[in-house]
Regions:
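Right-handed beta-helix
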Residues: 2-4, 10, 22, 69-76, ...
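Catalytic cores of peptidoglycan-degrading enzymes
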Residues: 40-45, 51-55, 75-79
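Asp/Glu-centered strand-loop micro-motifs enriched in Gly/Pro and often flanked by an aromatic residue
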Residues: 8-14, 60-65
Length: 223
């Protein structure tokens, strides 16, 4: 049942509205900086665009200088309820897809995935598939972070193909398309052996001993 439009006449509280009602977001910048959202009521007909109210947004968490802050987009559809039915005290209790705005991902019967996707295409996805749980953080550009329980790996990947992988064997693999640079006051490597496929070049080499199958004479090459 639709509420009586006259309940909003003059903004008075002469009538009360119980239940939940659809509304359209018109403004998200509260002039009082209290987090309210300005909404209009399309079920009032053409007059609904002119009848607006500043509604408090129900959040998962709200406290002093902290909380869960995700505001709805202007012109998106939300659901509004009224405190004790008082029309001058509206609350936004949630947002809905209405057929015009599509879901970020089609629903599946297994219902394994939970996700948050933003306007720019940034995606945070939790996959609860049995034995293959996975968390993925991905940018539309292709940058990606994957925590994969099935593969027992953590992968950080740049859109250009550079990659850092930590796997279940305890290996850390770095793949770069160009150089890998380390800048620090000191770098300590603790390992019984360090292998290099190419040339090792340094300004100064201090060593306890050298074992080599060949020797190239040159400045500083004094044994």
């Amino acid at each position: 049942m639709r509420p009586d439009p006259d309940a909003f006449d003059g903004g008075t509280a002469s009538r009360r509205l119980f239940g939940l009602y659809p509304a359209l977001v018109k403004d998200i910048v509260d002039p009082d900086a209290t987090g309210r959202i300005k909404v209009a009521f399309p079920w009032l007909g053409e007059a609904g665009n002119d009848v607006t109210a500043w509604a408090r947004l129900v959040s998962l968490y709200a406290d002093d200088d902290q909380g869960w802050m995700i505001l709805p987009e202007v012109d998106s559809e939300v659901i509004v309820g009224f405190e004790a039915g008082a029309i001058e005290r509206p609350y936004i209790v949630g947002a809905v897809w209405n057929g015009k705005e599509a879901l970020p991902q089609s629903a599946e019967a297994a219902n394994n995935k939970r996700l948050l996707k933003t306007r720019s295409g940034t995606l945070l996805e939790f996959d609860d598939s049995e034995g293959a749980a996975k968390v993925t953080l991905q940018m539309q550009s292709g940058h990606k972070l994957v925590l994969d329980d099935a593969a027992q790996s953590v992968t950080l990947k740049h859109s250009n193909g550079c990659e850092l992988v930590m796997n279940t064997a305890g290996q850390v693999k770095i793949t770069a398309n160009s150089t890998v640079e380390i800048t620090a006051s000191a770098v300590n490597v603790h390992a019984p052996i360090v292998k290099c496929d190419g040339i090792v070049q340094c300004t100064t080499l201090i060593t306890q001993s050298v074992v080599s199958a060949s020797y190239t004479p040159g400045a500083g090459n004094v044994w």
